[in-house]
Structures are given as structure tokens and as C-alpha cells.
Amino acid sequence: MATYTCITCRVAFKDADIQRAHYKTDWHRYNLKRKVADMPPVTAENFQERVLAQRAVAEERDKVTATYCTVCSKRFSTFNAYENHLKSKKHLELEKKAVQAVSKKVKILNEKNLEKGLAVESVDKDEMNAAIQQAIRAQPSSSPKKVPLPPSHASSSPVPMESAGLLQSKERTQKPPRLQWFEQQAKKLAKQEAEEEEDSEEGWEEMDSDEDLGSEEEMEGVEEEEEKQAEAESTCAIGAIPVTDCLFCSHHSRTLMKNVAHMTKVHSFFIPDIEYLVDLRGLIKYLGEKIGVGKICIWCNEKGKSFYSTEAVQAHMNDKSHCKLFTDGDAALEFADFYDFRSSYPDHKEGQDMEVPAELPSDRELEYDDDTMELIPPFRCKSWSSFFNEILQAAVWSVKNGGCY
């Protein structure tokens, strides 16, 4: 009596090796699926009949699919019609002409090779013709291949300007805005370095005491050029976020101070080493260009993913709590132009970090703080640390009293 059986297929085996081999067959897997579906198993003969029937259906489906003759440029709905077309007189004539055309091209290429000194291997003409005929013979395909238009048609039907513009815009969008912005910054740095080298090479020119510095018209022209240059530097780049707009949302403030207060309170925006910051406007303007033009997160920088809209960058920074500057290691050098750390040096002496004019202009009034009555000299701004302390105190007071700041 056989002791090795398969309960799923309801069969018995003589030894364990045949039983293990049975577990790997498609018949056993098929019966397992039927068992899961609460269906009775099938015998081995019935399974083979099902497999053959499925193969016949697949072959019939392949024959029914649409076929295309590349020589005659015709499509046929059934495989039988396609086979009858291959035996037709018209198709055979076109195929013969195609073979002659290809043979002519091969002959021309062989003549050119002989002129260049390249030896042509001796090949039987019958074999060559058979190979050419087999190569160009129409093969069944599901869909016809698109044939490119000849140059005459291409020139007679020019591409519309709108489609050309779309193609150009697609080519532009292939390069991420972040990469474009980094390239612009690299060009600016290279230009600044080149200008500094030119200035150092030119040096100072000695002038005689008798020579004049120039007429008044020349001085006015120089002043106008300086004013134009200052205006050009003050204007924001295309797409940059203005200094009065929030870097992380669509909020607009009347002044830069109110904008910084909004970002500090709502988005927990934090500027490191605020006591050494000397150019707040320049820093906010730079961050506005970085987010608006470069579409870059100020915390992820080049390590994060690429964004293609300002709204996407702002949403990312708000969702990930990246409303802060990344200043670890060498990353702090990015903002070095907006800070002045000379007051933190051990050998620093008061008054060395700025040039105090000998006499103040008589037409300039001194400013003072309304709360502390502290004088604010015209050549020095109020401490940013005290400014942020006032913002935080006002925010705490508004939270305690349930009001809005």
C-alpha cells in the first residue's frame, strides 16, 4: 500500500522523491488554486487538455490581431487576408521593385568602398538577393510604423509658433531651477573675482598737483552712473520674493521689520548670531531670490529634492519645519557678507569696526528710541537683538491676554 499521497490532487506515489517532484508541477499548483476557491481538483489528463485549449485560444488571438504590410502600406483586419495579400500579383511586383532598389543601393555602396580601397568579400548573388528579399519582406505587426515626412513636406508645413514655444519651454524645464540659480551665482562670483583682479592689476595712478579732477559735468556723470548702479542692485530679480513679503507664505507686510516680525512669530523663523548681523535687508533679499528664483529650501539647500514652483518650496518648508537657516560647518560662509564678527575678536577695540565721521552734518537730525530715550547715531542701526527681544515679549503678552499681535 502506498504511503505517500497528495491530498490536494488525490493521488498516491511509490516513494518520497516522486511526491516532492509532484509538489513542483503546474498541475499541483493549479489544484491548490482550485482548492482555495472551493472547487474540486482536476486529473492530470484534464489539466493537459485545459493547457492545450488555452494555447490554441492564444494562437487564434494572435492571428485575429490586425496586420500591416510595409511594402504596400496596407493594413488587414485578419491574418488570412494578410496571407492572401502576400500571394497577390500586385504585392509581388512591389516587392520585386523594392528588392531591385535595395540591390542598386548595395551596388553603389560597394563601388564607393572599392574607390576607398576597401575590399568587398565575394558573395553569391543568389544568397545576396535572398537576404535582401527576406530583409524587406513584410512582417506582421500590430500597428504601422510612422514614416517621417520628406524635407519638401517639412519645409512646406512649418511648425506653429505656439508649438515651438512649448517645445522650448519643455527644454528649459528639463533643467531644474535650482541648478539654474546655482549657475547664476557661480557666474556672479566669477565676475566679481575678475573685477577685483582687474582693480588690483590697474592700481592707483599718480596725478600731478596741477591736474584737475575733472569738470563738474564729468562728476555729475559719474554720480548718475553710481545712482543707476545702486538702483540696479536694489531691484529684485525676476521671480524673487520682495523683502516685504513672507518667505514661507503669501503674507505681505508694509515694512521689512513687520515682515521679519511676522516670520518670527508665525513660522518660528530664526536668524543665528543676530547680534553680529549688519545687513538684514540684504540677507532677506538674498533668501527671497534663493526661494523665489532658485526654488531652493533654505535648510535642505542642494541636498533636497528639486522644486519647480515657489509654492511647492514654501509648502515643503512649512511641512518639514525648515523655516530656518542651515549654518553648520562651511554652510555658514554662504551668509558671510551679511555679518560682521570683528567685535568678537579678542584683540578687537571699540571703534575699529566702523568709521565715525569727524563732524555730523548740521542738516541731519539724531534719532532716539521713544521707550528708552537711547540715541541712535545715523551711522549705526539699533541692535537687532533688542529688536527681536521686543518682538518676543509682545508675542508672549498677546498669548497671555488672548489678543492678536
Swiss-Prot record:
Judging by the UniProt lineage, the source's domain of life is Eukaryota
Q: Which InterPro entries match?
A: Matrin/U1-like-C_Znf_C2H2, ZN622/Rei1/Reh1_Znf-C2H2, Znf622/Rei1/Reh1, Znf_C2H2_jaz, Znf_C2H2_sf, Znf_C2H2_type
| Acidic residues biased stretches | 194-228
Q: Which residue spans match zinc fingers labelled U1-type?
A: 4-28, 67-91
This protein's GO CC annotations: cytoplasm; nucleus; preribosome, large subunit precursor
A Pfam family that this protein carries is zf-C2H2_jaz
Protein's UniProt keywords contain Repeat: yes
Q: Which cysteines are joined by disulfide bonds?
A: none
**The protein's role, per its UniProt record:** Pre-60S-associated cytoplasmic factor involved in the cytoplasmic maturation of the 60S subunit.
So what family is this one in? Answer: Belongs to the REI1 family.
Record note on quaternary structure: Homo- and heterodimer. Associates with pre-60S ribosomal particles.
Q: What is this protein called?
A: Cytoplasmic 60S subunit biogenesis factor ZNF622
**Source species:** Gallus gallus (Chicken)
Lineage, highest ranks first: Eukaryota, Metazoa, Chordata, Craniata, Vertebrata
